[in-house]
Amino acid sequence: GGNVGVWAAKMAKRFKTVWTFEPDPDNYACLVKNVPDNVQHMRAGLGDRVANVGMTLFPDNCGAHYIDGPGDIEIITLDGLSLPACDYLCLDVEGYEPKALCGAKETIARYRPVIQIEEKGLSERYYGIRKDEAERWLEREFGYRVAKKVRKDVILVPR
C-alpha cells in the first residue's frame, strides 16, 4: 500500500508517473499531502477482484493492516485500470501480495515490469498462502526469476 506516501514520493523522482494505492483513510489523507503532482493516487487496495472488505487496523503501526472479511474498504484490480505502461511494480501489502498479483495478470503479461514484493510470511499468517507463493507463481506463470533479495523484499525480473 501507499501508506503515507514516502515511497511514492521517492519513486516520483525516478519515474515520469507513479501510481499508488492506499485503502486506510487516515494514511491516505497523509499520502495526498506528501506526494508530488506526478503521483496518481487512489484510496483503494489492490486484490484479485473488485470487492469491499473489512480491515484490521493496528493503532501503533500505520503500516500493519490486514484484510479480514466484508466491510467498506474498496479493493480494485490493477488490470481494471488499463494502465498505459508499467515498468516497475512494487507491492508491500501486508501479505496480500499473491492476491494483488493475480489482479495484475494482464498488466504483468503485457508490460513485463520489474516486480518487487515484500515476503515476510504475512500471507501465510493472515490468508493461509505460503510465504513464497507470489514468488513461485511469478516464476511458474510468467517466467520471472529472482534477481535479488533485500531484507524481506524480493526483486523479480523477466527471463
Task: Label each region the model flagged.
Residues G2-R159:
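Phosphate/nucleotide-binding beta-alpha loop and adjacent structural elements of enzyme active sites
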